[in-house]
């Protein structure tokens, strides 16, 4: 009896863990709120009942009498059944997979498994007919939900392109299940990559074959029993809940593979571009293999043989017309014959020497010798410009035509903010001739270290980086940007151009949520971002300032009385200057708030001088 009571205490600990897991896994999709609430209420009812009748239950010395009192007299059976039944909706929801992640022992699947096996032991000890009926219906619902997700979820994050000596990850187009002609399970072995006897499913499509790895590595029919799966989870086999299929290679079309051997049990095929990589496939259904799949592979081989004459003709044409795969930018080799002396003398003064073969691709125009921001800064702080602004606020954009004319001759598409040729994007020390963006004290409005950034994806918050990031708001000639990067590894995570289309709120004391619309310009990420930092209040003030339309504030400042207080004059001047910041080419003001840039007295004196 003592051992039984110790096991009961462990079961109650699992129930408390279920409550905690449901409260931690938040937010969840709206359609799961009802199931999650039912589980929490049922679990709390069990805990409260146990605490209320603890003295009575503790004095019972017989297991049968204890279970009869606990389950029947106190009516806790229904609460146990509610937790298990509603857990199916959470674990096998197709929109969110967080409730079936069992990488740690205290995860939600582990806790449900412990509760299931405990209630199963109650049923065996009591020989309860009601519990037996419940487990029969529960196993059926569990198996149906398991098979539905396992057969309809497809992943494309582990697609490998195989060529000579390489096994690299590549992007792949998604497979439309509606275009599948037939699908069948096989066992696959690839000796080259130490892959042995894994379960796969081959899809026959209109334009090729798709090889999908079955993630649980077992057939759904044999593993869909709830008791079998929960026993596997309790023994540490987490793969049983890695549901779905993962595409292994890009779609194999005619000419991409060759058949080395084929018989009544399976086949051995190899890739056209990697002869040493052999795929040994063995069918699990001999009748289906002989009647369908064997002829299917043979038809692909015959079609490839019929196309071989075209391939030979293509190679002859390529050789005859000087095609060269090493030529960059052109389909044909550039004729590099040296021109005659007469031609060189006639063209020396009006054209440069002919480019080399490696210089045929497009190139950038010659950069400016001085930063464009310095030119804009001079115009921005021009005293005559400020005089015109103070006289007529409605003509602020017209008064800034000097800076606009400077930008009009500059190549807008030459954007160093999205320059992909820069391996060290946020390098602090950089060559003067480089066109990379540099984050310095001069162009940084605010910089926060040790921040955690997450993105709302697939109905859950996903961290965009495992490391603590540095978040900065910087000024560039294209506008004002918020960027997140890893200062230790020189890796940027995202950059967002701040405008009034972007909304930001403070959800908690240390969390700022930013909503970036899909049509936002010059933003490397869209959707909802969450920035967690101890300086959330300071960050929110700066973000709110640069994501608010100040057009009305400018009009209001122009109509203010000349005898207004000094503080209101400063405020209106800042609003007036910010109307210029909305132009994408301007530099944001150095004076923003006392916490960010400088003292209040310096701010007031600077703005008074400009006005």
From Swiss-Prot:
Top-level taxon in the UniProt lineage: Eukaryota
Family to which this protein belongs: Belongs to the UPF0508 family.
Protein name in UniProt: UPF0508 protein SCY_3114
Species this protein is from: Saccharomyces cerevisiae (strain YJM789) (Baker's yeast)
